[in-house]
């Protein structure tokens, strides 16, 4: 099965680019990243904090199948509604260093939009270690859920 979410990772570079086109109006796609109730539904995580503003911060908590809790946090550096979010992302209590994420939201038509995530890692090795995880499948599944959640909201 072809993944709708595309990941481009050039050899020898410490970044990657994730793109996905959605059958969602731009405003709803952006909302899916800033409204805690919607984020929880498509990310499958509990939102402990989400300050969707410049210099805001966020913290999410996920429980794995064995009951272990994992937390993720970051700071929002740029925030332009319906256009851009620049933020850090950190997996707490892991060996993975903080990464920098540039999220760009683009209107394609009145009912379709595109998300581009440019993620920069501390090193090429850090990026490659992330790609060894079931990263592509996981983000594709999350984006599929995002589409499903917004489809329910649109009705």
Model-derived features: where do they sit?
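Intrinsic-disorder/low-complexity, polar/charged segments enriched in Ser/Thr/Lys/Arg/Asp/Glu/Gln
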Residues: 13-19, 57, 71, 84, ...
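Hydrophobic ligand-binding cavity/cleft-lining segments
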Residues: 1-46
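Hydrophobic/aromatic beta-strand elements that line small-molecule binding cavities or substrate pockets
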Residues: 20, 48, 72-78, 89, ...
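A short, structured loop/turn motif at beta-sheet edges
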Residues: 26, 77-83, 104-114
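Beta-strand/loop substructures that line and gate deep hydrophobic ligand-binding cavities in soluble
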Residues: 93-137
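Hydrophobic pocket/interface hotspot
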Residues: 29-30, 39, 58-60, 76, ...
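Short, highly charged C-terminal tails/helix-capping segments
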Residues: 151-155
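Short beta-edge strand/loop motif at the mouth of beta-sheet-based domains
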Residues: 17-18, 36-71, 82
């Amino acid at each position: 099965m072809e993944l709708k979410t595309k990941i481009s990772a050039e050899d020898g570079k410490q970044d990657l680019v994730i793109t996905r086109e959605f059958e969602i109006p731009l405003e709803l796609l952006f909302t899916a990243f800033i409204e805690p109730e919607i984020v929880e539904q498509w990310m499958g995580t509990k939102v402990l904090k989400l300050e969707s503003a410049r210099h805001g911060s966020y913290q999410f908590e996920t429980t794995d199948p064995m009951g272990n809790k994992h937390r993720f946090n970051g700071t929002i550096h740029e925030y332009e509604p319906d256009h851009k979010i620049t933020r850090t992302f950190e997996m707490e209590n892991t060996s993975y260093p903080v990464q920098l994420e540039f999220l760009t939201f683009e209107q394609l038509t009145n009912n379709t939009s595109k998300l581009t995530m440019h993620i920069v890692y501390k090193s090429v090795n850090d990026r490659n270690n992330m790609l060894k995880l079931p990263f592509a499948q996981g983000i594709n599944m999350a984006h599929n859920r995002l589409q499903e959640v917004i489809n329910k909201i649109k009705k």
